[in-house]
Amino acid sequence: MTNTTDGDLLLKNITAQAPFPICFADLEKAVAEKIPAGPFGYIRSGAGGEQTLRNNRSAFEKYSIVPRFLNDVSNVHTSINLFGKTYPTPLLFAPVGMNGMVHEEGELAAVRAAQQLNMPYIQSTVSTYALEDVAEAAPSATKWFQLYWSTNEEIAFSMAARAESAGFEAIVLTVDTVMLGWREEDVRNQFSPLKLGYAKGNYINDPVFMASLPNDSFESYVQGVLQNVFHPTLNWEHVRELKRRTNLPILLKGILHPEDAKLAIVNGVDGIIVSNHGGRQLDGVIGSLDALPSIVSAVKGQIPIILDSGVYRGMDALKALALGADAVAIGRPFIYGLALEGQQGVERVMTNIYDELKVSIALAGTTSIEGLRTITLVKNDGMEVK
């Protein structure tokens, strides 16, 4: 519960001694000026002509709120429950790979921020630091492991088992990376963090992966990762087999079609992340927020729905929650914070997003996530959504 009458959620940013970018555009500008073009372009860009990247933003911008007033909104409640645990906010850290290319402490700094904020942290398969190192860095944080299926399936099962042994509490299987998206910005910059070794953490510490290499050279490792990180054969039988191999809840990340959401339930999946990979895989894809309502309708509350892709501020999170998401995952913004100020930068970015969310909930005329389900949203064409 947060008291919203003290008015300090915005003012604390005005009176702070060290100015920090307050919005996504300011963050992006500051990071562009700080880190090399290769890493910046990798993080900023989308696939192809970046239509999906634009679709994500336009999806949020097409929805407007019709607020209600003369309600007591002095105490805003933002807690949620996921898989039997209660969290003070509906915000999560989305899986973002290769954090070491923007900050030397990479995922270690990010997970410490998540621990401090009590927000679930989803670690990427292609992380700079191994999952065991991340677990040790933030022992009390809620940690989930994002899994890229491997061409050698035993590598995928090995990583899932390691995550379970290290205390991770869920497996997030990404389904939209059957091959690498058409990343034109990386070609322009001649930059591939995979080839530079920024994804080494989980692979070089995996016994099954290392045993599959012809030798222990850097070149052998890079080729091994490139051969295994994409999975064109991934199908529902693999999902069922993963379910048999782990005791952890399994979420599918990358679901955009309601029929796939229904199949996820049929196949025993425990949660869904509505996502288009931040616009980085297939160009021309529906914005994640535009995909959300039909998936909410298909799922009917049977399993949790989390949304990511294009969530840059608290108002974006509010709209996703109002349209039925149970939680919202943040990606690019926290990575920009990491690039600027390490752990402290991550905390500041996520806190600003959360503070804007709290203020916006109150200004919309309600006091809780549940209350957001009752507010009126309209599209820019004037059509009432709910």
UniProtKB/Swiss-Prot annotation:
Gene3D superfamilies xref list: Aldolase class I
Keyword flag NADP: no
GO terms of molecular function: (S)-2-hydroxy-acid oxidase activity; FMN binding
First-tier enzyme category under EC: oxidoreductase
Cofactor: FMN
Keyword field: Flavoprotein, FMN, Oxidoreductase
Positions that bind FMN: 95-97, 124, 146, 174, 253, 275, 308-312, 332
Catalytic center residues: 277
Biological role stated in the UniProt entry: Oxidase that catalyzes the oxidation of a broad range of 2-hydroxyacids in vitro, such as (S)-lactate, 2-hydroxyoctanoate, mandelate, 2-hydroxyoctadecanoate and (S)-2-hydroxyglutarate, to the corresponding 2-oxoacids, with a reduction of O2 to H2O2. May be involved in the utilization of L-lactate as an energy source for growth.
Subunit annotation: Homotetramer.
PANTHER family: FMN-DEPENDENT ALPHA-HYDROXY ACID DEHYDROGENASE PB1A11.03 (PTHR10578:SF143), S -2-HYDROXY-ACID OXIDASE-RELATED (PTHR10578)
Protein name according to UniProt: L-lactate oxidase
Organism encoding this protein: Lysinibacillus sphaericus (strain C3-41)
